[in-house]
Amino acid sequence: MNAQFDDATKTLDTLGLRCPEPVMLVRKTIRNMAQGETLLVIADDPATVRDIPGFCRFMEHDLLQQETQATPYRYLIRKKEGQL
């Protein structure tokens, strides 16, 4: 495993869930996190390859790292400073 993924503040397992559930859970989880904390998202829905980066751009969170070559996909998101 990658050290950066290992250091995530929280982990969200969305394996088996399909669009739009993974992104909805990411949004709900990030709302309850402190600014600057990181979230590791584990997913197997192919739509997350598009949806999670799009969510991060729209909400201005930092997508620090992603692994999408094979399932399970992994995304590391940092809650943007100044976001409530």
Swiss-Prot record:
The record describes its quaternary structure and partners as:
Interacts with IscS.
Q: Name one GO biological process term.
A: tRNA wobble position uridine thiolation
One Pfam short name: TusA
Q: Cross-referenced SUPFAM superfamilies, in alphabetical order?
A: SirA-like
Q: Which residues form the active site?
A: 19 (cysteine persulfide intermediate)
Q: Which InterPro entries match?
A: Sulphur_carrier_TusA (IPR022931), TusA-like (IPR001455), TusA-like_sf (IPR036868)
Give the pathway. Answer: tRNA modification
Q: Which UniProt keywords apply?
A: Cytoplasm, tRNA processing
Explain the purpose of this protein: Sulfur carrier protein involved in sulfur trafficking in the cell. Part of a sulfur-relay system required for 2-thiolation during synthesis of 2-thiouridine of the modified wobble base 5-methylaminomethyl-2-thiouridine (mnm(5)s(2)U) in tRNA. Interacts with IscS and stimulates its cysteine desulfurase activity. Accepts an activated sulfur from IscS, which is then transferred to TusD, and thus determines the direction of sulfur flow from IscS to 2-thiouridine formation. Also appears to be involved in sulfur transfer for the biosynthesis of molybdopterin.
Q: Which NCBIfam families match?
A: PRK00299.1
Task: Classify the source by domain of life.
Answer: Bacteria
Location in the cell reads: Cytoplasm
Give the signal sequence positions.
none
A single GO cellular-component term from the record reads: cytoplasm
Q: Which family does it belong to?
A: Belongs to the sulfur carrier protein TusA family.
List all membrane-crossing ranges.
none
Write down what this protein is called: Sulfur carrier protein TusA
| UniProt main location, coarse | cytoplasm
Q: Which molecular-function annotation in GO is an example for this chain? A: sulfur carrier activity
